[in-house]
Swiss-Prot record:
Entry-annotated residues carrying N6-glutaryllysine: K96, K119, K120, K126
Protein name, entry field: Histone H2A type 1-F
Residues recorded with modification N6-(2-hydroxyisobutyryl)lysine: K6, K10, K37, K75, K76, K96, K119
Annotated positions of the Phosphoserine modification: S2
N6-(beta-hydroxybutyryl)lysine, modified sites: K6, K37, K120, K126
Subcellular location: Nucleus; Chromosome
Assembly information from the UniProt record: The nucleosome is a histone octamer containing two molecules each of H2A, H2B, H3 and H4 assembled in one H3-H4 heterotetramer and two H2A-H2B heterodimers. The octamer wraps approximately 147 bp of DNA.
Amino acid sequence: MSGRGKQGGKARAKAKTRSSRAGLQFPVGRVHRLLRKGNYSERVGAGAPVYLAAVLEYLTAEILELAGNAARDNKKTRIIPRHLQLAIRNDEELNKLLGRVTIAQGGVLPNIQAVLLPKKTESHHKPKGK
């Protein structure tokens, strides 16, 4: 008898991803790998990829929330690049963060200079008296 049966030893615990431990949807392991392979520094701490994944997830959720609102305003159910553009450019902080970013097929914000608008005149047309 070699004693290699199933009766001895503990069962191995189910693997739990670092993303699920942190309560995130974004992949912490992939972010960690990219930080290591990107030559940003010689060593990468354990908390850095978790923090970066959380920040990326928050920014993505914020942009998608605003883009979804823009799509709904245009009576559409699918977000297109135009909705992303409208969402980012109408939000002051996101516009500052992504000011130099060009979104393909995004178009521009509708804007007419005040000088070009027709002048408002009072419409009190008095009938000519006799």
